[in-house]
Amino acid sequence: MEKYHGLEKIGEGTYGVVYKAQNSDGESFALKKIRLEKEDEGIPSTAIREISILKELRHSNIVKLYDVIHAKKRLILVFEHLDQDLKKLIDVCDGGLESVTAKSFLLQLLNGIAYCHEHRVLHRDLKPQNLLINREGELKIADFGLARAFGIPARRYTHEVVTLWYRAPDILMGSKKYSTPIDIWSVGCIFAEMVNGRPLFPGASETDQLMRIFKILGTPNSQNWPDVFKLPKYDPNFPVYNPLPWETFIKGLDDTGIDLLSKMLKLDPNQRITAKQAIEHPYFKETN
């Protein structure tokens, strides 16, 4: 720890406090300190998971893990430092980001997620607060505390993942067999938030979250989601809503952008576009 000085608290992650610090050369780093409550408990499984995943992932749109320091009663992860997160940027840009900026961030996010998915890693907690941005306009995915290597076919996982507003309807209805489409749903929610300047589905509870999704995208049925009836929390008495036209709730997005968003926010996870397919979508054809 002697290598770093000038600690300044900048946030809290899934399981630890994050500080900004500098080394002797004046370079800035983000230090994530994980307190080890009891010596006999050892390192939290979430921390071990994040370390093992991040050590394997090397991509320009994924935050770099430089060092791991095992100090007395605490573990310190040394990450590259970025100036701010996407949530803060959206908050200061009244009415949403400029279309060229939103497009650039979305493409970078998809590139990072496609890389994760190719390496059999689900992030499981994508939200604007976990997307870091530097002054050059580079976006990097952070906070892999909930990430988990996935097998084929999809295994049964806990459904208590992803902050409520970015949680897919299949998870909300109790699906424990899920895969890459849960990250794509979150990406779609983030895309809409960048464009609109506010969250698309800001639910107050799991039930409220589902109802907000259904009121906009329509209630699932055997036509648009054949397997929905198999989910533990599916209710045949859900109120029936018809889908709204996209332009009524998404402002300032052209037809190709709406087409891409609609493919990310499919109710049925099996119908959602993959990250790799999304990168090839016509929406990005004008992007350098």
From Swiss-Prot:
- Describe the outcome of a gene knockout: Normal asexual development in host erythrocytes, normal ookinete and oocyte development in the mosquito vector, normal number of oocyte and salivary gland sporozoites. Normal transmission into the mouse host.
Subcellular location per the Swiss-Prot or TrEMBL entry:
Cytoplasm
Active site (record annotation)? D125 (proton acceptor)
Which residues carry the post-translational modification Phosphotyrosine, per the record? Y15
- Which SUPFAM superfamilies does the annotation name? Protein kinase-like (PK-like) (SSF56112)
User: Would I find Protein biosynthesis among this entry's keywords?
Assistant: no
GO molecular function per UniProt? ATP binding; cyclin-dependent protein serine/threonine kinase activity; metal ion binding; protein serine kinase activity; RNA polymerase II CTD heptapeptide repeat kinase activity
Q: Where is the signal peptide?
A: none
- InterPro entries reported for this sequence: CDK, Kinase-like_dom_sf, Prot_kinase_dom, Protein_kinase_ATP_BS, Ser/Thr_kinase_AS
Example GO biological process: cell division
CDD domains in the record, alphabetically? STKc_CDK_like
Phosphothreonine: residues carrying this PTM: T14, T158
Question: What Pfam families has UniProt attached to this entry?
Answer: Pkinase
What is the annotated role of this protein in its UniProt record? Answer: Serine/threonine-protein kinase. Involved in the control of the cell cycle. Required for entry into S-phase and mitosis. Probable component of the kinase complex that phosphorylates the repetitive C-terminus of RNA polymerase II.
Could you identify this protein by its name? Cyclin-dependent kinase 2 homolog
Q: Which organism is it from?
A: Plasmodium berghei (strain Anka)
Source species taxonomy: Eukaryota, Sar, Alveolata, Apicomplexa, Aconoidasida
